[in-house]
Curated annotation (Swiss-Prot):
Residues 1-3 are annotated as: Interaction with thrombin active site. It is found in: Secreted. GO terms for cellular component: extracellular region. Sulfated. This is Hirudin-1A. Belongs to the protease inhibitor I14 (hirudin) family. It comes from Hirudo medicinalis.
Length: 17
């Protein structure tokens, strides 16, 4: 799992697998 910006804004960090 990698924590990265999953939003267009790139201001939010979510859990992306």
């Amino acid at each position: 799992v990698v924590y990265t910006d999953c939003t267009e804004s790139g201001q939010n960090l979510c859990l992306c697998e």
